[in-house]
Amino acid sequence: DRRVNLLYSALEGKIMRIFPIPEDSNNKWVSYPEVNDVEFSGADSLYVNNVLQLYFQTLRVSRESNNYSQSEELLESIKGYQVKYGSDVLPSDLKISSEIIYNKVDIFNRLYKWYLLFGFSLLLILILQIFNDKKFYNILIKFIEYTIYFLFILNTIGLAARWYIAGHAPWSDAYESIIFVAWATVIFGIIFGRKSYFTLASATLVSSIILSVAHMNWLDPSIANLQPVLDSYWLMIHVAVIAVSY
């Protein structure tokens, strides 16, 4: 139902909130279908009511002539309008680029497959080693161990990237809480895995299961604004401690 509503909003154009309301105390932005619900003044009203139509018209012409200069000028014009009235909440170019890379890499969706592969491989080799202790097994175990360390570093970078892009700690909703618990599971597996590789293998497998749950259809992985009720430094610490303790 949520995805159907999201698709419907996208088709209507309501999802593209590209026009900041001038001097709005809450820094609200509106989409083109919502423009008539807001009182824009003078030239601003004329601009927001016509710029998108002009842009789509130039796109059709540009497609035939293969010259997109007019379309690019209008895009720069829209960006200038956003900077003029919405600079307080407009993300930097670096943050925009970071989010694009983050979405393309899709690190957490890939990680659970790698965690599953190497966690299960480590567990299988450890079981085989009980019956036949060969030097070759020790080499494989060390290789898998350092590979898991590398995957954990990627996991940490993914969380840090999400923190940077969102502007708040990555455990503010169901999806973020689950991927954070998966990260904590691996770090404790690494700490206690020094005494037993079975601990590291088990923690990696559990983390894989947790991450796979995070990517089920009923969880939304999108990066969203923090809800006002959660906008508390101490609450973020409290949630982190409780989540990790599980």
Descriptions of predicted regions:
Residues 78, 173, 238:
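Conserved hydrophobic/aromatic pocket- or pore-lining residues that grip, position, or stack substrates
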Residues 70, 218, 245:
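Short, contiguous, pocket-lining structural segments
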Residues 1-101:
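Soluble extramembrane regions of membrane proteins in the secretory/endomembrane system
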Residues 47, 73, 155-156, 226:
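Alpha-helical protein-protein interaction elements
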Residues 236-246:
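Alpha-helical transmembrane segments
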Residues 93-217, 221-224, 231, 241-242:
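Core alpha-helical transmembrane segments of integral membrane proteins
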